[in-house]
Amino acid sequence: MIVNVIGAGLAGSEVTYNLGKRGIRVRLFEMRPKKMTEVHKTGYFAELVCSNSLKSEDITNAEGLLKAEMRLMGSITLEAAEKARVPSGKALAVDRNIFAKEVTEAVESLESVEIIREEVTEFDPEEGIWVVATGPATSDGLLPFLKKLLGDDFLFFFDAVSPIVTFESIDMERAFWGDRFGKGKDYINCPLTKEEYEEFWKALVEAEVIEMEDFDRKLLFERCQPIEEIARSGKDALRYGPLRPTGLVDPRTGKEPYAVIQLRREDKEGRFYSLVGFQTRLKWSEQKRVLRKIPCLRNAEIVRYGVMHRNVYINSPKLLDIFFRLKKHPNIFFAGQITGVEGYMESAASGIYVAYNVHRILKGLSPLKLPEETMMGALFSYIIEKVEGDLKPMYANFGLLPPLKVRVKDKFEKRKKLAERAIETMKKFLEENPW
């Protein structure tokens, strides 16, 4: 039987690769580059559109634990990330183009995978196995069919992307290198005095934004909230948020600045840097004007402006079973951010999970739920079984895991024990239920 996968993002690529490398015939549909979305720039698979950071690898961090579990199950996302890694302190950050190219070439190399560069606008829900992994930027051509298939259980939130500037246009006479509390030198820090901060804040809150159809401030998801929305919540909101100076000492003064804008490397050569936490929906002309208020970026060359787009996801608790299958059509699976998991790694992890169970079904076995002691199992259980009311996008966090049997007061030690339990549980699960 052929497995049809719609969408070659992180989740779709994981589904395709994990099935294809095991000899399962897969037909992968990807409309790019023939038809582009409003946020993608290339035709590569697994293109990262929000940030180039895949976050922490430390297992005492929820994102790091998630990665550890994904490696145990097998992840093309993490294999490609290792080859595309750029310096980013304790975080795993990648060169976007190298990363996407690595994933694309890995999928294309599989003999059992057929790649069709066409937009899917409909399919027969009664025939074959389908995996819908079209992501938050699902095409307008497919949406009407999905709405007809699913009913009115579509939700959405708004997402925003940060600007990118060239390294050579940054005033390094005023900027300084460093991570918080002296842990490395991977970030460029642009310090602001009180007067400079207030001038920047005033320009930001007064700047014109791009209005969007159906825009509602309450729909802005907190992890990608536009910087101008944060600024409007209070004059010091940025100083306690993305511009907080904590742990960053300016070597010129020997003190923490009043506020700091951090820039993170975007490519291996270090030619481009993105503004950390600067997701925005400002008009492009306003972005240029506002960034000029930052002394280190007074002459910055912006190579990608921040943009904002609407993300689509489905009401998974109502529509899907725990294996991410449609309750009405169990031959149709959903994977990735369209299910309500939030984040790059969470999206990729859901693709691995779907591939694992599709593989079991094709072998004549029953699908399996991952143990809730694992981060993957806890996240997927929350999305499908534990949400009350309408689903809100959810990312990996330790609050999802069942408590330890013995109370541990120290926060770090508690997370360490939760992580160790999760990894051991996943290892045992895979030993008993291998691919």
Swiss-Prot record:
EC number: 2.1.1.74
Gene3D superfamilies in the cross-refs: FAD/NAD(P)-binding domain
Cellular component terms per the entry's GO annotation: cytosol
UniProt KW Nuclease keyword: no
Principal location listed in the UniProt entry: cytoplasm
Highest taxon above the source species: Bacteria
Alphabetic keyword roster: Cytoplasm, FAD, Flavoprotein, Methyltransferase, NAD, NADP, Transferase, tRNA processing
GO molecular function: flavin adenine dinucleotide binding; tRNA (uracil(54)-C5)-methyltransferase activity, 5,10-methylenetetrahydrofolate-dependent
Catalysed reaction equations from the record: uridine(54) in tRNA + (6R)-5,10-methylene-5,6,7,8-tetrahydrofolate + NADH + H(+) = 5-methyluridine(54) in tRNA + (6S)-5,6,7,8-tetrahydrofolate + NAD(+); uridine(54) in tRNA + (6R)-5,10-methylene-5,6,7,8-tetrahydrofolate + NADPH + H(+) = 5-methyluridine(54) in tRNA + (6S)-5,6,7,8-tetrahydrofolate + NADP(+)
InterPro entries found in the cross-reference section: FAD/NAD-bd_sf, MnmG-rel, MnmG_N, TrmFO
Top-level EC class as recorded in UniProt: transferase
Job description of the protein: Catalyzes the folate-dependent formation of 5-methyl-uridine at position 54 (M-5-U54) in all tRNAs.
Record-stated family: Belongs to the MnmG family. TrmFO subfamily.
PANTHER family the UniProt entry points to: GLUCOSE INHIBITED DIVISION PROTEIN A, METHYLENETETRAHYDROFOLATE--TRNA-(URACIL-5-)-METHYLTRANSFERASE TRMFO
Family annotation (HAMAP family): TrmFO
Name of the protein this chain belongs to: Methylenetetrahydrofolate--tRNA-(uracil-5-)-methyltransferase TrmFO
Gene, per the UniProt record: trmFO
